[in-house]
Swiss-Prot record:
The keyword Protein biosynthesis applies. GO terms for molecular function: translation elongation factor activity. It comes from the Bacteria. The lineage of its organism: Bacteria, Bacillati, Cyanobacteriota, Cyanophyceae, Synechococcales. This is Elongation factor Ts. Pfam families: EF_TS (PF00889). Keywords: Cytoplasm, Elongation factor, Protein biosynthesis. PANTHER family: ELONGATION FACTOR TS, POLYPROTEIN OF EF-TS, CHLOROPLASTIC. Its main location: cytoplasm.
């Protein structure tokens, strides 16, 4: 692998507008070859999407998805910059795909990492710090292990971090960036709600003997 220097990462970022981590990953994937890294970023839809990410996305659409059998339903708000784009096929297709993703991910609760409340993060840290397999380890080693475990756990709660259900080589965030690059506008997943039939309802379940007894008493 080529020597991936901070300057190389910065130069690639300046050329593409992509984030530092995306640039570093692109260079690692292409052995430090800048031209190939550029191509890698474009294929991921990242190169031009990042430059648009700071623009206001106040238009968009609220989509709904009902899974087969009508047992799971999703409402999702996807934002863009113009009403024209919101009505377009690329945007509407993305809205449907991301809504389907939410339906397929029952553990997902937040759009992005920065939406997770600090008390949830702290609670996860306390749980991990108290695990038996960490007892006796030096504090600095314990901190690193816990940091990795927490990052993994928090990513499980975040929609944008999920592997895309139709192509696990992509994350949902990659999918959104690809669409943004194609249409030339900033796109944001703002919020979502997932409904599961019967969720939160306590069912009165009889065993067979109780059911027979209740029939006899009628």
């Amino acid at each position: 692998m080529g020597n991936i220097t901070a300057k190389l990462v910065k130069d690639l970022r300046d050329k593409t507008g992509a984030g530092m981590m995306d640039c570093k990953k692109a260079l690692n994937e292409t052995d430090g070859n800048v031209e190939k890294a550029l191509e890698w970023l474009r294929k991921k839809g990242i190169a031009s999407a990042e430059k648009k990410s700071g623009r206001v996305a106040a238009e968009g659409s609220i989509g709904s998805y009902i899974h087969t059998g009508s047992r799971v339903g999703v409402l999702l708000e996807l934002n863009c910059e113009t009403d024209f784009v919101a009505r377009g096929d690329i945007f509407q297709s993305l809205l449907k795909d991301v809504s389907m993703q939410v339906a397929a991910c029952p553990n997902v609760e937040y759009v992005s990492i920065d939406q997770i409340p600090k008390d949830i993060v702290e609670k996860e840290k306390q749980i991990e710090m108290g695990r038996d397999d960490l007892s006796g380890k030096p504090e600095n080693i314990k901190e690193k292990i816990v940091e990795g475990r927490i990052a993994k756990r928090l990513n499980e709660l975040v929609l944008l971090s999920q592997p895309y259900i139709k192509d696990s080589a992509l994350t949902v965030e990659d999918l959104v960036k690809q669409a943004a690059a194609k249409i030339g506008e900033n796109i944001k997943v703002r919020r979502f709600t997932r409904y599961t039939l019967g969720e939160g309802i306590e069912k009165n379940e009889m065993d067979f003997a109780d059911e027979v007894a209740s029939l006899k008493s009628n």
